[in-house]
């Protein structure tokens, strides 16, 4: 089983940071939207993997990561991935960069409707925003 880790960054408006993946047939989920994340490397714990992926893809260094969920999903090649998802609040100080994909931006939850998203990501974004409202 492959392990993945990701971070849903929520801003003060309740928007979530999403990446528009490149439209290349050689990658998984081309031309889809997703939150920052990727594979967990050998000898790396899930939180460290999530932090690394977030920084690599956006340049953003999160202060606190809160665990959101661990669950399985199927990739386009039918491989099962165990994803370890965290969430954090955007500090409004650091610039968000697009170091991977074609675009990186905060989207309102309503804007996720009609977009091609990775499996289960809309539900997880809603869940992260609900958790953020409790802080």
Tell where the protein language model's regions lie, with residue ranges:
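Unchanged
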Residues: 39-63, 69-124
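Conserved hydrophobic "DFG−1" position in protein kinase catalytic cores
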Residues: 9-10, 18, 88, 106
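Short connector loops at helix/strand junctions that flank enzyme active sites
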Residues: 2, 30-35, 79-83
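Conserved Nudix-box catalytic region and its N-terminal flanking loop in Nudix hydrolases
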Residues: 15-56
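Conserved N-terminal beta-strand and adjoining loop/helix that marks the start
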Residues: 1-17, 36
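Charged phosphate-binding loop/patch that engages nucleotide di/tri-phosphates or the phosphate backbone
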Residues: 121-135
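Surface-exposed, flexible loop/turn segments at secondary-structure boundaries
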Residues: 13-15, 24, 73, 112
């Amino acid at each position: 089983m492959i392990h993945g880790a990701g971070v849903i960054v929520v801003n003060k408006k309740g928007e979530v940071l999403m990446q528009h993946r490149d439209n290349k047939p050689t990658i998984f989920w081309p031309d889809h939207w997703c939150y920052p994340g990727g594979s967990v490397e050998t000898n790396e714990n899930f939180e460290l993997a999530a932090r690394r992926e977030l920084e690599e893809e956006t340049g953003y260094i999160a202060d606190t990561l809160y665990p959101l969920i661990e669950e399985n999903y199927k990739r386009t090649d039918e491989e099962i991935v165990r994803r370890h998802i965290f969430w954090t609040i955007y500090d409004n100080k650091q610039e968000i960069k697009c170091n991977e994909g074609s675009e990186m931006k905060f989207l309102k939850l309503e804007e996720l409707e009609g977009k091609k998203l990775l499996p289960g990501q809309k539900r997880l974004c809603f869940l992260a925003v609900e958790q953020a409202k409790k802080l």
